[in-house]
């Protein structure tokens, strides 16, 4: 089988694609893959490092206000459509799968027009503009949250709940009991992990600094991941405050988030779709702080999917400070029954066979 995959821009589009590709390769080592992305997206480094063939097309996103840039976007779409058609014709895929990002539009549009089975995978609880555009053309629409069904109401017969392949990958990962020691952490107390995504969050870092004295007194320990860009500033600030941290570990980033999650008791984080899939796959309780800087405020909608099921609580960024952060953590960590219930609710939301479900759809489409 020959599988062409397209998706890019952010890790939330790329890692689910790689998880699915890895799974399909395990099931059938003869499967051939081609990944189509952009030169500027993260996929241009991540995908080749993962060992997959990679080709690029030139595309840019739509500016949501009236702008002459959208004429350039339209031009890029037209030219990239013909480039995508050439790539598809040359590779001769049995199926084409899009995991989101603007690069998917010309690739899946071309494949659909050529009569090749196509699947889009929507990770969020609000559909992205590219997937909305492609919904009419594709064979199947795979989703991770029930809330997104309304965005595909016209195409309900195409919609299939699959979950996110990243969840299956995490659920099958083996816990490494030596991991914490390898990054300088002793599991003497329960661990609260705070992180603001791959680039970190200025407001979350500021709230952490405000809460330093309180965190030092707690019966749980705090691991704060600042993001590489903020690390020196936070470290220097802690030094200038003459703080000797006994109950807190500050790290710029974590290379193996899977192992960190598996050794954590509570997570405080943004509510990107892939992060939520990881939390529910592992059954972790969480405090979600949606980024207000994303398209259509979709992270708040993502968070509500867990909050409504009592698998997480939420603090809006405008309400976030040291006091509110500590208070919310204490409400969960100081109530064992509450923490356990949230963990069970989180686990119940997890779909841990997403790649298997997608494989079934693929085989139903590839005759």
Each predicted region: which residue ranges?
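Donor-nucleotide binding loops and adjacent catalytic segments primarily
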Residues: 46, 50, 175-178, 183-267, ...
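Acidic donor-binding loop of glycosyltransferase active sites
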Residues: 93-95, 251-254, 262-277, 284
């Amino acid at each position: 089988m020959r599988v062409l995959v397209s998706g890019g821009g952010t890790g939330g589009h790329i890692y689910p694609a790689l998880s699915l590709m890895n799974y399909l390769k395990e099931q059938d080592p003869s499967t051939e893959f081609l990944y189509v992305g952009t030169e500027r997206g993260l996929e241009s480094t991540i995908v080749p490092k993962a060992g997959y063939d990679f080709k690029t097309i030139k595309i840019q996103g739509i500016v949501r206000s009236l702008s002459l840039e959208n004429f350039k976007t339209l031009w890029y779409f037209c030219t990239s459509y013909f480039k995508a058609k050439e790539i598809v014709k040359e590779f001769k895929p049995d199926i084409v799968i899009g995991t989101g990002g603007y690069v998917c539009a010309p690739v899946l549009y071309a494949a659909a027009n050529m009569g090749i089975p196509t699947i889009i995978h929507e990770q969020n609880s609000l559909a992205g503009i590219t997937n909305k555009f492609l919904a009419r053309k594709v064979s199947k629409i795979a989703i991770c949250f029930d809330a997104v069904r309304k965005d595909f109401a016209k195409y309900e017969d195409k919609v299939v709940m699959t979950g996110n392949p990243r969840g299956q990958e995490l659920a099958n990962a083996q816990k490494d009991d030596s991991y914490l020691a390898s990054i300088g952490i002793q599991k003497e107390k329960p661990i609260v992990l705070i992180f603001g995504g791959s680039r970190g969050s200025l407001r979350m870092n500021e709230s952490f600094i405000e809460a330093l004295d309180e965190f030092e007194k707690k019966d749980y320990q705090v691991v704060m991941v600042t993001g590489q860009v903020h690390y020196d500033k936070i470290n220097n600030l802690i030094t200038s405050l003459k703080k000797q941290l006994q109950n807190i570990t500050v790290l710029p980033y974590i290379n193996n988030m899977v192992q960190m999650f598996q050794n954590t008791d509570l997570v405080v984080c943004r509510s990107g779709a892939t992060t939520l899939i990881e939390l529910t796959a592992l059954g972790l309780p969480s405090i979600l702080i949606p980024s207000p800087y994303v398209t259509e405020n979709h992270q708040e909608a993502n968070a509500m999917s867990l909050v409504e099921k009592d698998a997480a609580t939420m603090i809006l960024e405008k309400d976030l400070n040291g006091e509110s952060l500590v208070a919310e953590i204490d409400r969960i960590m100081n109530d064992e029954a509450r923490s356990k219930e949230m963990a069970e609710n989180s686990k119940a939301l997890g779909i841990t066979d997403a790649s298997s479900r997608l494989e079934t759809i693929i085989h139903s489409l590839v005759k």
